[in-house]
């Protein structure tokens, strides 16, 4: 009986208003810096890392050691998130951003998408928790790999959800088609969500993943119009000024592709990130829900770094404080044809 009570105390959970189980965040023990060489060898084995020379291995080890010191510092502060070693642990933050994000910088540019200003107070009566996953309207987490195509993954993630909302069926759309055939955006070198929607309108539609598989590299366009699964009728770019109104928009429209600064997301493991700075937008992700855990309000975001990242591929960031610079004018969604 005592063992059962101890187990129940260690493995606790809370329920949201939609009966979704959310694990309570438990802070881990800090990494012993003196054991960094052992951690590094385990990391190499776990993630099948291969280095071209001993010099490169030493260089990567130094980055790894610096990163676990940073992880310890984050886990020591009064934050509601947990950070751990993951596959990015031998990379600098700039390397992760350069290789695994892909939101284009610079001017927004003119396109056909309608611009909508999202401002003002939210609806008085709105649920404290909401998540499109509870309604089976969000497809599985994907991995963009070392290709700066986050814009394609976030944009098509929103389209996949629109399809599920309309037809009550989940399908995976072809990010590779956008990487290869969207000639306004720059494939693995970056792009914007709303211009991707414009290009889908121009091309005529987008194929499913199994008809145009993802390769994580830009290849000659091989689009097959007779295989189009979804078209875009209208697209929208949102100028976000109010997080309360964004809650309403999310519930009424569906999952929305948003832009964030991903630097503070790289070593995330679980919980709610309370400290996420904005030093420049660089990553596109899919906003799927919001809620409250331990009195901390949060947004739930679907990332494109694989299901072994974060909370099964998802990350939660604090709501109401412009976490990661998410309140900007690059959020987008589309109406399917």
From Swiss-Prot:
The record's account of how the chain is modified after translation: Synthesized as an inactive proenzyme and activated by proteolytic removal of the inhibitory propeptide.
Active site location: 150, 283, 303
Keywords noted in UniProt: Disulfide bond, Hydrolase, Protease, Signal, Thiol protease, Zymogen
GO molecular function annotation: cysteine-type peptidase activity
Record InterPro entries: Papain-like_cys_pep_sf (IPR038765), Pept_asp_AS (IPR025661), Pept_cys_AS (IPR000169), Pept_his_AS (IPR025660), Peptidase_C1A (IPR013128), Peptidase_C1A_C (IPR000668), Peptidase_C1A_papain-like (IPR039417), Prot_inhib_I29 (IPR013201)
Gene3D superfamilies in alphabetical order: Cysteine proteinases
Signal sequence, start to end: 1-16
Name of the protein this chain belongs to: Viral cathepsin
Organism: Mamestra configurata nucleopolyhedrovirus
């Amino acid at each position: 009986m005592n063992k059962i009570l101890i187990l129940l105390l260690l493995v606790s959970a809370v329920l949201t208003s939609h009966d979704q189980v959310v694990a309570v965040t438990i802070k881990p023990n800090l990494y012993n810096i003196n054991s960094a060489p052992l951690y590094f060898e385990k990391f190499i084995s776990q993630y099948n890392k291969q280095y071209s020379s001993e010099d490169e291995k030493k260089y990567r080890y130094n980055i790894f050691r610096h990163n676990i010191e940073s992880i310890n510092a984050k886990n020591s502060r009064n934050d509601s998130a947990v950070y751990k070693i993951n596959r990015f642990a031998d990379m600098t933050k700039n390397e992760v951003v350069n290789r695994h994000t892909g939101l284009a910088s610079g001017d927004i540019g003119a396109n056909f998408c309608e611009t909508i200003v999202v401002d003002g107070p939210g609806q008085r009566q709105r649920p404290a928790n909401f998540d499109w996953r509870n309604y089976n309207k969000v497809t599985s987490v994907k991995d963009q790999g070392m290709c700066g195509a986050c814009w394609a993954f976030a944009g098509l993630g929103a389209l996949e959800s629109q399809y599920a909302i309309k037809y009550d069926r989940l399908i995976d759309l072809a990010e590779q088609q956008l990487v290869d055939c969207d000639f306004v955006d720059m494939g693995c070198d970056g792009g914007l969500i709303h211009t991707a929607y414009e290009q889908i309108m121009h091309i005529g539609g987008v194929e499913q993943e199994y008809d145009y598989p993802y390769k994580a590299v830009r290849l000659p366009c091989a689009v097959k119009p007779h295989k189009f699964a979804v078209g875009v009728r209208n697209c929208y770019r949102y100028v976000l000024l109010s997080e309360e109104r964004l809650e309403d928009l999310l519930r009424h429209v569906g999952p929305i592709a948003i832009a964030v600064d991903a630097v503070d997301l790289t070593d995330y493991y679980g919980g709610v990130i309370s400290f996420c700075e904005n030093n420049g937008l660089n990553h596109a992700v899919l906003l799927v829900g919001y809620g409250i855990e331990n009195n901390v309000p949060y947004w739930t975001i679907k990332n494109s770094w694989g299901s072994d990242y974060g909370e099964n591929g998802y990350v939660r960031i604090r709501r109401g404080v412009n976490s990661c610079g998410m309140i900007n004018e690059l959020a987008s969604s589309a109406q399917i044809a």
